[in-house]
Amino acid sequence: MKIFNSLTKQKEIFKPIESGKVKLYVCGMTVYDYMHIGHGRSWIIFDMVVRYLRMRGYEVTFVRNITDIDDKIIKRAGENKESPAALAERFIQILHEDEKALRVLSPDQEPRATQYVPEIIKLIQKLLDNQYAYTGQNGDVFFDVRRFKDYGKLSHRHLDELQAGARVEVSDSKRDPLDFVLWKKAKPGEPKWDSPWGEGRPGWHIECSAMSSSILGQPFDIHGGGLDLKFPHHENEIAQSEAGEEKPFVKLWMHAGLLEINKEKMSKSLGNIISIREALKESDVEVLRYFLLSGHYRNPLSYSKENLENGRLALERFYLALRGLPVVNHEKTSSYTDRFYEAMDDDFNTPIAFALLFEMVREINRFRDNNQIEKAAVLAAELKCLGNIFGLLQYSPEQFLQGAKKEADVQEIKKLIDQRNEARAKKDWKTADQIRDQLTDLGVAIEDSSDGTSWRQE
């Protein structure tokens, strides 16, 4: 098996530190808001990685953290007039609901930053002892970036090129703008813990270093996360962990490509962030999972209605091939499974793996056409087994195809309403009335108001 290592910028033959066992840490969420589809892509990608490694016989220890204390949590809690702990707990429950809705496997361990404050303090003390950290004039403790000679080795940028990242605060207390905070001195009304440097709370980056190494040891096999975390977060994790423990931190780094919305960057400033909950109102979970895994995990992917519809049609092909076949136990594999493994062993090449699954669909249909139902059923069982690695083909064909028809009907209704609104805007009343009649024939009642057009199926 070969996996692309962001650290070396090349595919490497994957050999776990301990034979047959894989220790994997993935950065989780800061719990102050709903999970969006960008988070969803990263979660589903690493869910696929865990499922595949386990299918290949590895004993995987999968750790994904929760950041439950952070500036953003404190700010949002203040706006909501609730405690940071209450806000975090509420969104942790929401996160778990979304995780279940996405069919993402729960991690083996899900550490929270607030549970690891003693380990965080211990690591900061080591950094101070090793002279990689200092206390600023304001009482915060900072990491001395220029003291760590390998800084920039993950993002492949020289220190002179680097600018303070979006989540690295500029402060007069720093010796250098690139230095980042390890421990923040307590402010009135904020959560705080005792430390050798006074009351305060951990910085964001140090949390992941302490949690991952405390649970998995150092070094461990794979550290994953979204590409947006590569710098400064993951770069800072390496610096802290290797300066503190004086040994390598992680063997292999994996980064999931970013998700775009209609080929535009997803951002709050553009107002185009889509939550998982919104996405699952529009599309079935299998359609969403298929779409999010359809491109190579390292490449950017554009979320659009057209791409989701393509995903729905692709899944229809799978389920139409399975419909009406007897269910048999999957006991033996064919060359298709070998070729599937070959694709996935090449840096989790899901586009080639999906192409192979469609080959299987064509073969199933040929068997069916030739009335070789037993052969079709055996291959269908193999197809379902491979689909499970992607969290797909979990419905009965009847369930999915009926749901897909309803979804298609809703999309058609929305399309007709948009066309009618355009006609009304142009004062083309004849066309608007014709479309209203079409909708009535579909059993749809519409109501126009100053807020727009609402509809319901009767």
Curated annotation (Swiss-Prot):
Catalytic activity: tRNA(Cys) + L-cysteine + ATP = L-cysteinyl-tRNA(Cys) + AMP + diphosphate
Enzyme type, top EC level: ligase
GO molecular function list: ATP binding; cysteine-tRNA ligase activity; zinc ion binding
Keyword Mitochondrion: no
UniProt keyword list: Aminoacyl-tRNA synthetase, ATP-binding, Cytoplasm, Ligase, Metal-binding, Nucleotide-binding, Protein biosynthesis, Zinc
CDD domains per UniProt: Anticodon_Ia_Cys (cd07963), CysRS_core (cd00672)
Binding site for Zn(2+): C27, C208, H233, E237
Motif ('KMSKS' region): 265-269
Cited Pfam families: CysS_C, DALR_2, tRNA-synt_1e
Gene Ontology terms: cellular component: cytosol
Cofactor dependence: Zn(2+)
Gene Ontology BP term (one): cysteinyl-tRNA aminoacylation
Intrachain S-S bonds: none
Protein biosynthesis found in the keyword field: yes
Main localization category: cytoplasm
Family: Belongs to the class-I aminoacyl-tRNA synthetase family.
Listed NCBIfam families: cysS
Oligomeric and partner information: Monomer.
This protein's name: Cysteine--tRNA ligase
Gene (name only): cysS
